[in-house]
Structures are given as structure tokens and as C-alpha cells.
UniProtKB/Swiss-Prot annotation:
LRR repeats lie at residues 135-163, 187-212, 214-240, 317-348, 349-374. PANTHER family: RNI-LIKE SUPERFAMILY PROTEIN. The keyword Repeat applies. It comes from the Eukaryota. Residues 12-60 form the F-box domain. Pfam families: LRR_At5g56370 (PF24758). This is Putative F-box/LRR-repeat protein At4g00320. SMART domains: FBD. Keywords: Leucine-rich repeat, Repeat. It comes from Arabidopsis thaliana. InterPro entries: F-box-like_dom_sf, F-box_AtFBL13-like, FBD, FBL60-like, LRR_dom_sf, LRR_FXL15/At3g58940/PEG3-like.
Length: 507
């Protein structure tokens, strides 16, 4: 076991007297590079590195923006040497490995990929690799292929790969990941057939994140059929790379199918599919939807996402982006009823109108909380509404059409909403030619007044005012307090800013 040593002050060194297994357990709680450096203090500990079950290499916090390129290069080389040394030590001992975590800037991605087969041979359960880009994701990305061994592991339970220089997923044979429960792939390129192969080999998958995904458009069939059908899946996050979504078009016709009866949480950000073949989310509780149109779909303007929203209409919590609000305008007459929805959050945008919002609120008979991220879309100098190029109504009191106003007020007066929260109240649109502080804030106040004057069940309205000026807060406070009438018999209005918190109650 080795003799017990005394520290320089005469006290006993309790750690050195512990059994090897206990010391190894203690070292496993340290970042691996730190654990390796402790061998300078006690040579007896060095062999124990071979049996550490969790390897944690996080060097990201060590890179100072003020470092020179040469200092960064030397730091990266030193980091890679430490990882190589520890992996070699563990390979020699043929020890089992639970977790392999790497996060470092400035490391060549292909070098990191070479570590994957080494840890797979050790029966690793958890791989987490996060390598920020040195060039920026996009056209300059290298898209190194992920090693094929990673897709036939019999031990992997969790796999997370985030290479911001991009990674390529392409496996010749079958995929077999019988133990995999969590799969995160961020900044990856693959074709839809590879996605089908990947999902078919994950029979116990519970959490799937495919973020910043790029389809290999040139290799896609026509039409392109994408089916996500994993019975065990509970969490799904799917988004395509933002710049790719803004490109001209995804050329093949896309037919999309979701058959995930046990899914609880969905985050879906994409362009609208040409057709939703099947949408089945029987157990869905919370969803975040971000849909936008391709240039071709904007020209045709005949896209209908009714089937998709029919599939998620049983949610209790829903988040919609501003583009999704615009897309919903295509199915105002066929919008499903969200019977279970109690919490709705809407992100607003300066170019997006609210013409679909009255229809949406009308179809939420049990909605309790309504949250707006910003109050954008109207109040821009020389313009009446953010939907200037579209027909239809917008939930806006600036409209002179009394019939339209009557319809909107009728919709709001039947809403059961009890709480309205407005985040970033007072935030300007950000376009210099349209920005007018007084006009923007006055318009946002007018919208809040409309809620107060027409919604009878309101119990609380909270404005999170985006201003450091207390005087601005006081102005809004006084204007709202002077309202001659409100629809609710008892409604509290609260204004929260950086410095003060004001509230009053209508009685």
C-alpha cells in the first residue's frame, strides 16, 4: 500500500494512505488534465490515471482572447499531448471507460476524430465532443467524416458531437446502436437516406437532437421522403442550418412524416415541408415551432400546415416564432382547436403581422398565460401594420375599419387568458429608417390598452420594460393607470425594469 507520509507541517498525508480505488475515485472528479498534473506530487498516483472511469478534458476556459496565434498553437499541442498520453496509458491497462468528454478551441477536428475509435475499444458509455470552429460554419467547413465504428457500438448510451467546422455522417453498412438513449449531432451533413438508416439502428433512443443540419441536396431522390419514427423517443429537437434555410430552395420535393407516439417535447425549426404525410404526437406536452417559407413557397403562397398543427394540438405549452405566426396565416380557416393549451409564447418580429393571432386565440379555449417576446409588427413610421403586403386583419387598434376592430375585440373578449407577459417591452425595431422611440412605445402602450379594455378574465399584465431610464417607466405607468375603463373587474398591472418595479390594480 506504501508508507504513510507526513506533510511539511508534520501532519499526516491522509490522501496517500487511501486505497488505490479510493484515490482513483477522487481523481475522477477532477478535470483529467488537473488529475494528471497531481502525479508530480505523488508518483504513485500516475498508474491510477489508467483506471479513471471518466475522462474530462475541458480546455476552453484557458484560451484568452488576448493570446497570440503562437500561444494558442502551443496550448493546443500541449492539450493534445496530454489527451494522447492518458489514452495510451489507459489502452495499455485495458481499463473500462464510462465517459469521454472533450471541449477545446484550436484543436484540429481530424485529430479529435482519431480518439473516437480508441475510446470505443474500451467500451465507453458516454462520448461528448465539443470543438468550436476556428473558421466559422458554412462554405469553408471541412465536414470530416465521423468514424464508422461509432455507429456500431454495443455499449454507447450517450453520444454528443458538436464540431462547428462541420461533420459528415455517412455509413456504408447498417447502423446498430442497441444501447443508445441520447443522440446529439450539431453541425452535421447527411442525406435523408442516412437519417433513415441512423434512426432504424437506434431501438432504445429517448432523446434526439439534430441541430444545424445540412441535407446533401445533390444526392437526394425526387421526391424526398423523410420519416422520423422511433417509438421510444421522448425528446426531439430538429433544426436545419439557418443560412441553408435562407438559401434559394431545397430542390427535391420533401414529404415529411412524424410517428412518435411517446414524444413529450418537440423543437422543430425548418422550412415548410411540401407535404406532411403523417403527424403523430400522442403524448406531446411542450412544443417549440419555427417554420419559414422557401422563396418558391412565398411565390405560390398556397402552403398549408394544418396537418402539422393537428398533430400537435394536444400540447399544454407552445412556443411560436414570428415566421410561424405568418405561416399560420395560410390556414386560418382550418386551424385546429388547442383544447389543452394553457401557456402560449409568441416571438414577434418587425416584418410580421398578427393577422393569424385572433384565429389562434379563438381556438385556445383554456389558455391561461399569453407571453409576447417583444411587441413588434406595427407602430412603424408611415406604416399601419407589419403585414403591409398581405391582406387579412391584424390585431391592431390603429386600423380604422370599425368592422375589423369589432371582430378583433369580440375575439379578445371571449379569451379566457388570465395572465399576459410582455418581454422586452419598449424594444425598438432596429431599422433606422423606421425607428421612432415615441411612436414605437406609444403604439405598444396602445396595444396593451386594447388587451386591458377587451379581455374580461385578465388578472395580471406584466411588462418587462427594456429601458435603464426610470422616467420612461413612470410615463408608461401613468398612462396605463389613467385608463377610464378595463374589461376585468380586478386586474393588476406590473412594470418591471432594470431599476424599479411598479404595480397598481384596477378595481
Amino acid at each position: 500500500m506504501g508508507s504513510k507520509k507526513k506533510c511539511f507541517d508534520g501532519s499526516r498525508d491522509g490522501i496517500s494512505g487511501l486505497p488505490d480505488a479510493m484515490i482513483c475515485h477522487i481523481l475522477s472528479f477532477l478535470p483529467t488534465k488537473v488529475a494528471a498534473s497531481t502525479t508530480v506530487l505523488a508518483k504513485r498516483w500516475k498508474p491510477l490515471l489508467a483506471f479513471m472511469p471518466n475522462l474530462d478534458f475541458d480546455e476552453s476556459f484557458r484560451f484568452d482572447p488576448r493570446m497570440t496565434c503562437e500561444e494558442r498553437r502551443k496550448g493546443s499541442e500541449s492539450f493534445m499531448l496530454v489527451v494522447d498520453s492518458v489514452l495510451a496509458l489507459q489502452a495499455e491497462a485495458n481499463a473500462t471507460l464510462n465517459k469521454f468528454y472533450v471541449k477545446c478551441e484550436g484543436v484540429e477536428q481530424n485529430s479529435v476524430l482519431e480518439w473516437i475509435p480508441k475510446v470505443l475499444k474500451r467500451g465507453v458509455l458516454d462520448i461528448d465532443l465539443q470543438i468550436p470552429s476556428s473558421r466559422g460554419f458554412g462554405s469553408n467547413s471541412t465536414f470530416y467524416p465521423l468514424p464508422s465504428e461509432i455507429f456500431v457500438s454495443k455499449t454507447l448510451v450517450r453520444l454528443k458531437i458538436q464540431f462547428q467546422d462541420g461533420a459528415n455522417v455517412n455509413v456504408e453498412g447498417d447502423v446498430s446502436l442497441p444501447m443508445l438513449k441520447t443522440l446529439h449531432l450539431d453541425y452535421v451533413k447527411m442525406d435523408t437516406r442516412m437519417l433513415q438508416k441512423l434512426l432504424s439502428g437506434c431501438h432504445t433512443l429517448e432523446e434526439l437532437l439534430l441541430m444545424n443540419l445540412i441535407w446533401k441536396e445533390s444526392s437526394e431522390p425526387e421526391p424526398c421522403f423523410v420519416s422520423v419514427s422511433v417509438r421510444t423517443l421522448k425528446i426531439l429537437k430538429f433544426s436545419r442550418f439557418e443560412n441553408f434555410m435562407k438559401a434559394k430552395d431545397f430542390k427535391p420535393i420533401v414529404l415529411l412524416s412524424f410517428d412518435i407516439p411517446n414524444l413529450v417535447y418537440l423543437e422543430y425549426l425548418d422550412t415548410i415541408a411540401d407535404k406532411y404525410e403523417q403527424v403523430r404526437f400522442d403524448s406531446l406536452v411542450k412544443a417549440s415551432i419555427g417554420l419559414c417559407k422557401t422563396s418558391k413557397q412565398i411565390e405560390n403562397d398556397n402552403n398549408n400546415v394544418t396537418k402539422l398543427f393537428m398533430g400537435i394540438c394536444n400540447v399544454t405549452i407552445l412556443y411560436l416564432t414570428e415566421d410561424t405566426l405568418k405561416v399560420l396565416g395560410c390556414c386560418r380557416e382550418t386551424m385546429p382547436v388547442f383544447e389543452n393549451l394553457i401557456h402560449l409564447t409568441i416571438r414577434t418580429g418587425v416584418h410580421i403581422g398578427w393577422k393569424s393571432l385572433p384565429h389562434l386565440l379563438k381556438n385556445c379555449p383554456n389558455l391561461q398565460t399569453l407571453v409576447f417576446e417583444g411587441m413588434h409588427h406595427i407602430y412603424r413610421k408611415g406604416r399601419a401594420c407589419g403585414d403591409v403586403d398581405e391582406d387579412g386583419t391584424c390585431m391592431c387598434k390603429n386600423l380604422d375599419n370599425m368592422r375589423v376592430k369589432k371582430d378583433i375585440d369580440a375575439c379578445l373578449s371571449s379569451s379566457p387568458v388570465k395572465v399576459i407577459k410582455i418581454l422586452n417591452f419598449g424594444e425598438l425595431c432596429g431599422f433606422c429608417e423606421f425607428c421612432d422611440v415615441e411612436e414605437d412605445v406609444a403604439g405598444q402602450i396602445k396595444q396593451v390598452k386594447q388587451f386591458l379594455e377587451t379581455m374580461p378574465d385578465l388578472e395580471k399584465v406584466i411588462l418587462y420594460y427594456n429601458t435603464p431610464e426610470d422616467e420612461d417607466v413612470m410615463k408608461v405607468f401613468k398612462k396605463l393607470k389613467k385608463l377610464p375603463r378595463v374589461a376585468s373587474a380586478k386586474c393588476e398591472v406590473q412594470i418591471i425594469s432594470d431599476n424599479i418595479n411598479l404595480s397598481f390594480t384596477f378595481r
